[in-house]
């Protein structure tokens, strides 16, 4: 399980005995998370300090315990908001070379249609002194994925994802 831009997500800790987890984020986030988790018994979780906007980010992943000959799930929730379109495309292109066919990628993206969710995310980013660097149409995103040899299997809107996956998890 590759958790890109893992932040302070705790998903990995619930499933650490069932899979190997790679928490991937900026150096300062990973260092802070390591410090906060130093007294927690953590197995099968590897923290990787990676700047995904850099060309050579993939080398850090490949030098870890990541095994490209095994199926994996890559979570990139919230990531596409903070990379330029070119950075996001390059990242996907590099990653796709090292994903075993049948692996899955899960991500959300800011839409060019000014949805309520996109406006909320823009406001949250601004409050965190960040800015959203890109917005996508579905057709544009589909083309980017195609160029990276990736295929959309399922596309759901914010409301459906919340109802199916998040609501029951948080109740």
Over which residues does each language-model region extend?
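Alpha-helical subdomain
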Residues: 2-171
